[in-house]
Amino acid sequence: MSFLQDLFSKPFPSDKAPEVERLIEELVKIGKTDDFLTERRGTPGFNHQMRHNRARQIGARLDEIGGMALMEYTQRQVKRKTTKAISEHLEYCWDEVGKWRA
């Protein structure tokens, strides 16, 4: 999807917009401060697969709200607000959340 499509055609109900926007901003913050992956086992806030726990919880909630379309939209938003590398880490972090496959 292009930037304009994302701007004018949101993959979530309008009544969920505040929650979705808050969750996206939280993911951006996680990406910039903690990253979505870690290289060290046992890092607080990360699971045994070294994926960020809260980011996975957010992914599950986004899946409940708007499914794969919303998760893809969110990844594009994270990429626009951070870097390609960070968005790729999110892609792997979300593996097996809903229908998401890295």
Where is each model-derived feature located?
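Short intrinsically disordered terminal tails
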Residues: 1-3, 7-8, 98-102
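Short, charged, amphipathic alpha-helical segments
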Residues: 42-56, 72-80
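Short, charge/polar-rich alpha-helical segments
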Residues: 3-28, 39-40
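Amphipathic coiled-coil alpha-helices
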Residues: 23, 30, 37, 51-54, ...
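Amphipathic alpha-helical binding modules
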Residues: 73-102
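Charged, low-complexity interaction regions
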Residues: 32-48, 68
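Short, solvent-exposed, charged loop/turn and helix-capping segments
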Residues: 65-73
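Compositionally biased, charge-rich terminal segments
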Residues: 1, 60-61
